[in-house]
């Protein structure tokens, strides 16, 4: 996919998924307007600012599929998995339109950028959609999405309280007493955001994963004041350094992906050394929480599937649920071999951010919460099928955890094996189905279809039919409905009377599966011993 950021905006506009607002709008109103809108919003005239703002681009599942050129949400997962397995390294170019205006030194002024506030208790304007690129001299290059709170015209905070590769890079730089250069590319295509949002192993370039998503290399261009690249298609680029202050400065609060207000964090400071942009740059503000949800969810799917593949588990479907903030909860259906319910849980729970996992058989629809709850209700014994792993690395944004400064939190991970237990006959889980469902259709009867009456037998005919039924079930056990079908020339009452006749004569019994058979025959079920 060669589409750039602006072409994506045009496509949203053409399909009615983006609305242009040309009237003056106060920047303080942007977040709530985006929250109320079903479409993305393009604010052409932000009061007091030169540049326009666009927000809410990926606020729905449908727009996330549009962004990655997919017809279904599952296709996004497949596409991302393909990109992870077959990354395409970035292509380096000399310059880009983001160099049309370059501001350095005292010219740097973040207050000239239309950076909105979001939630009512936010600690300040937040840059939310920047693709951040950093390099460690030993560990290689890393990309990710991090927020920056504006503190001064050329100073921000960065939220890297959560354990991740960027935090590791910053920690190593801090311990060496040096700043960590970073580039921040704002206004990139969602492909670059999705690629950089994947938590790749150290040494794997997330921009190469973004290239795999595109099917062609992501173009990167060199910064001016630091030895790092930026995304060439970006609207605005910040060249910066994470200062070696340690995690000592207050940062936040912020309305998080959890749909809750996050607490006050302690984080490093960031010095902005240069701002470059297109002459007519568009400022993209990623709206919380839903844009974060739909952009991040595919990376969770891919990570879970990769972990299960490594464990040798055959996966049918995965649902990273919205109720779990598309982050903490997963329901996974598998084609189970003995013992694999527990193996699947262990593999899935190894994915860092997952907190609660339910594994079900492949007859369960993981996207139907009633089906999943039914599987838990009918297939789980708590003492055998619920697994709790304590003291696992946890996400600091989990509000149920005790919060402590400077401590990477640990918490419990819970797995529920809601697959059919080993040793339980499969027929215990035969679902209710209805006789004649293949031919008796309600629409036909509403349209006037009628059924013909069968033979209504007298006592002699009932006795004769009983003998015929006895001959049939003497050869093989038959379900009651099969008998009614085999002797459909008679009306149902006559068939029922014939079976009653056999019961009175003490000739009728049932096999262990409930089928009708001859009493005392090899098929007959035996009463349990008292």
Placement of each model-derived feature along the sequence:
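Extended, highly charged
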Residues: 1-253, 257-269, 273-460
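Short, cationic-aromatic polyanion-contact patches
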Residues: 459-463, 510-530
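Short acidic, hydrophobic short linear motifs in intrinsically disordered regions
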Residues: 476-487
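Glycine-centered, phosphate/nucleic-acid-interacting loop/turn motifs that mediate DNA/RNA or nucleotide
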Residues: 506
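Positively charged, polyanion-binding regions of nucleic-acid-associated proteins
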Residues: 459-477
